[in-house]
């Protein structure tokens, strides 16, 4: 059943001087029907690595499980975490191998090793690194916010507010995006940390945005 569900999704990842911040909203849609109001689209796949999903839910969930297993095996065998660029390459190669019967997904991989990284990966395995990236039907609205307000020297606190504003802008204009916002901060010190919903709600109110 999940293989038939498409997420009209908005996801975003940004790099800062010493962190990566990733965020998504929660609405899951099938054409014009809201199938789920609390879908999970933001995942920790390694100690210092996160992944967001957009596209067919079943395809995306399989890829998340696969990546978690591969990265855990790598860590157990080598006693180090896989570099973020290698994570993106592994996922890219896997998708490219099945490009004629593709996983219908758009993915972001973000994390920190010697420096922060965000990669956008398409269904054919195309992988592009950038200082920020967004996927899903709401991404044009996210890019509008990021183009005008992003600065890599933002503090982590300012970066969290920025991704919340970006996702909120998409929710206002994209009918396939909605619900609560999930945010994760990835640093060398603390690894992957997903912020509590209560903290996100408080920030949304402080910024004068609509829940």
From Swiss-Prot:
EC number(s) per entry: 3.4.25.1
What is an example of a GO molecular function annotated in this UniProt entry? threonine-type endopeptidase activity
What is catalysed by this protein?
Answer: Cleavage of peptide bonds with very broad specificity
Q: How is its activity regulated?
A: The formation of the proteasomal ATPase PAN-20S proteasome complex, via the docking of the C-termini of PAN into the intersubunit pockets in the alpha-rings, triggers opening of the gate for substrate entry. Interconversion between the open-gate and close-gate conformations leads to a dynamic regulation of the 20S proteasome proteolysis activity.
Q: List GO BP terms, alphabetically.
A: proteasomal protein catabolic process
Subcellular location(s) per record: Cytoplasm
Broadest EC class assigned to this enzyme: hydrolase
Where, by residue number, is the active site?
9 (nucleophile)
What keywords does the record list, in alphabetical order?
Autocatalytic cleavage, Cytoplasm, Hydrolase, Protease, Proteasome, Threonine protease, Zymogen
Q: Which residues form the propeptide?
A: 1-8
Q: Which GO terms describe its cellular component?
A: cytoplasm; proteasome core complex, beta-subunit complex
The reply on keyword Hydrolase is yes
Describe its partners and assembly state.
Answer: The 20S proteasome core is composed of 14 alpha and 14 beta subunits that assemble into four stacked heptameric rings, resulting in a barrel-shaped structure. The two inner rings, each composed of seven catalytic beta subunits, are sandwiched by two outer rings, each composed of seven alpha subunits. The catalytic chamber with the active sites is on the inside of the barrel. Has a gated structure, the ends of the cylinder being occluded by the N-termini of the alpha-subunits. Is capped at one or both ends by the proteasome regulatory ATPase, PAN.
Which family is this protein grouped under?
A: Belongs to the peptidase T1B family.
Task: State its role.
Answer: Component of the proteasome core, a large protease complex with broad specificity involved in protein degradation.
> Mind telling me what this protein is named?
Proteasome subunit beta
